[in-house]
Design a protein with these regions (language model features):
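Glycine-rich phosphate/cofactor-binding loops in nucleotide/flavin-utilizing enzymes
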Residues: 2-26, 100, 375, 385-460, ...
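C-terminal helix-coil-helix/basic helical segment that borders enzyme active sites and/or dimer interfaces
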Residues: 56-61, 319-367, 380-381, 486, ...
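C-terminal amphipathic alpha-helical interaction region
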Residues: 445-453, 458-600
Length: 600
């Protein structure tokens, strides 16, 4: 369990970061890991170094058996068992440990994609919704790696629109067998899996899930796809032609498959964001290593300011993503702690604790995947022509990064989820967002005054002040959009996406700031670089939010009203910038000296 006392950590409501303030002791950070968790992280990292990276070329070339054997080896070490209860062959550990495994295994996207699918979307539906007989039969095999898992939801005509699947299931007259017909597309692990969780509509109407073994009559695995990235992972179509599935292999209740599909996606999105953090950390180390070795104009290019800016930008965004990820899993574990010990927790209760943080999961997915894209792109920029050559890892990082903005719901869909989910909770009264918006709207129509919400004598006071302003920008933009469009706001996708980006910057900056303040109180050397990265992030977050808010306001009004609203926005977003050149150089120096991400 986390070393920070459970009584200090707060299981805050999902999305409450917009309307509530937290203290550093109330949030979990990577520095709070217990000794047991650190040992697990070290074991996983060693496996990644000693087993995954040496096999990278063979995995990418799809050498038969290599990927599956390595996944089974990881499972033998317990990496596939953390989220599976002990009574079914698992370890039943906390979600922070599960997060660490995903984080530190993610040095090769082909492997992390395959293993992540196995331990996540292919296993958790069974853990949460399986009958006792189903769990006893399948979970020990999945935990040990004897069988690998795959998850079949997407179809050629229904990607993001998951409820529009065409695969049909028909129950036999005697009620013993379902016959499935349809085709699933882009199924990760399809070619190596022993068990498939497949979604179909019973009688063309009831959206349901089924557990299908590989040797089931009527199930055919199609040819491997030749992909832009994650080339070493198995991705195939799954064809169901009069596929006979025992009625006992229906997962959950008939017509309730959407609960399974959507709830497991929350974990999938969170874990994908975490995997992007691990991948970015590895890519940033390559950037730093090359920059230190490459000489130009008589010195290492790591000494040049523009290269240092690239390194600092990558480290700063990585720091923000990492802070969000461990803060989120800390809230999940704090919520689970309230349920009592592992044995007393029902699968439904665990699922509800995770579902509470659906918006944070979507935020991390979007931010993490786009952060990795930046880091991979700057690795190629740093390496120049070498970055385009397959002999070097940069081009693989670049190719592999793109899929993360598509997986687990595209980033466009997740942006709509972020804003839509918060508005839904606001309207239901689960989140006091509407009251906060009203208070802010009343405030901004009055002459400006100091609200006293920030103690300017505290550490990182400037960044705290910018965070307060950022929250006001988010509430102001959301309030204007809500008044303009009301219930029709969901139809304004561009506005929804811009609001999501502002909200994301709030969560990113607050998570980074709280972590930096917590480190500052510890007296550790790393506190300085954390503070510098938070300073860089604060300026960038407010600037990005202001631009997004301008687009929202312009879509909502015109003339004098728009000019008045823009004046209010300028007042909210007004700040004295930090010396970003100096901060970037300071952050880059720490990275270059460490030869890697400085908080690693």
């Amino acid at each position: 369990m986390p070393s920070t006392a459970a009584s200090q950590l707060v299981a805050a409501k999902g999305g409450s970061f917009l309307v509530e303030n937290r203290t550093p002791t109330e949030v979990f950070t990577p520095e709070d890991l217990s000794e047991e968790q650190r040992q697990m992280a070290a074991t996983v990292a060693q496996f990644a170094r000693d087993e995954i990276l040496p096999a990278a070329e063979e995995i990418e070339e799809k050498k038969p058996g290599v990927l599956a054997a390595l996944m089974r080896k990881a499972a033998e070490l317990g990496f596939a068992s953390v989220d599976i209860p002990e009574e079914y062959g698992g370890l039943g550990m906390d979600k922070t440990t599960s997060t660490l495994i995903t984080d530190h295994l993610s040095v090769l996207a082909s492997f992390s994609t395959a293993f992540g699918a196995h331990i996540g979307i292919a296993t958790l539906p069974l853990v949460w919704y399986g009958s006792e007989e189903q769990k006893q039969r399948y979970l020990p095999k999945l935990a040990s790696g004897e069988w690998l898992g795959a998850y079949g939801l997407s179809e050629a005509s229904s990607g993001s629109d998951a409820m529009n699947i065409r695969t049909r299931a028909t129950l036999s007259a005697d009620g013993t067998t379902y016959t499935l017909n349809g085709e699933k597309m882009w199924i990760t692990n399809c070619g190596i899996a022993g068990l498939y969780t497949v979604f179909a509509k019973i009688d063309g109407e009831k959206f349901s899930a089924f557990l299908i073994e590989r040797d089931t009559p009527g199930l055919t695995v199609g040819a491997e796809e030749h992909k832009l990235g994650i080339r070493g992972s198995s991705t195939c179509p799954l064809v169901l032609q009069d596929c006979k599935v025992p009625a006992g292999n229906l997962l959950g209740e008939p017509g309730k498959g959407h609960h399974i599909a959507f709830n497991v996606l929350n974990v999938g999105r969170f874990k994908l964001g975490v995997a992007c953090i691990g991948g970015a950390r590895h890519a940033l180390a390559h950037t730093i290593e090359y920059a230190k070795q490459r000489k130009a104009f008589g010195k290492a290019i790591a000494e040049f300011g523009l290269i240092q800016r690239k390194i600092a930008q990558g480290a700063t965004q990585l720091y923000a993503a990492e802070s969000m990820a461990y803060r989120t899993v800390g809230m999940i574990d704090a919520s689970l702690e309230q349920l009592g010990d592992h044995a007393s927790r029902s699968s439904r209760e665990i699922q509800k604790c995770i579902e509470e943080y659906a918006v944070e999961c979507s935020i991390l997915k979007v931010y993490g995947s786009e952060m990795l894209t930046v880091v991979a792109d700057e690795l190629i920029a740093t390496m120049g022509g070498y970055g385009y050559v397959e002999e070097y890892p940069a081009e693989r990082f670049y190719r592999d990064a793109r899929i993360n903005r598509i997986f687990e719901g595209t980033n466009e869909i997740n942006r709509l989820i972020i804003t839509g989910w918060l508005m839904k909770r606001a309207l239901s009264g689960d989140l006091p967002l509407l009251g906060a918006i009203k208070t802010l709207m009343d405030e901004v129509t009055q002459p400006p005054s100091l609200d006293g919400s920030v103690d300017m004598g505290e550490a990182l006071a400037r960044e705290s002040e910018l965070l307060a302003a950022l929250k006001k920008i988010a509430l102001f933009a959301a309030g204007v959009a809500s008044q303009r469009f009301m219930a029709a706001l969901q139809e304004q996708q561009e506005v929804m996406a811009d609001l999501a980006d502002i909200i994301t910057q709030v969560f990113a900056l607050e998570s980074a700031l709280l972590r930096a303040r917590k480190l500052g109180r510890s007296g550790k050397h790393s506190a300085k670089v954390a503070a510098d990265m938070t300073g860089l992030l604060a300026d960038e977050s407010v600037a990005m939010a202001e631009q997004a808010a301008k687009r929202v306001l312009a879509a909502c009004g015109e003339g004098d009203m728009l000019r008045t609203q823009l004046a209010i926005l300028r007042r909210l977003a007004r700040f004295t910038p930090a010396d970003s050149v100096g901060l970037s150089r300071a952050v880059a120096r720490e990275c270059i000296q460490a030869g890697k991400y400085p908080l690693q």
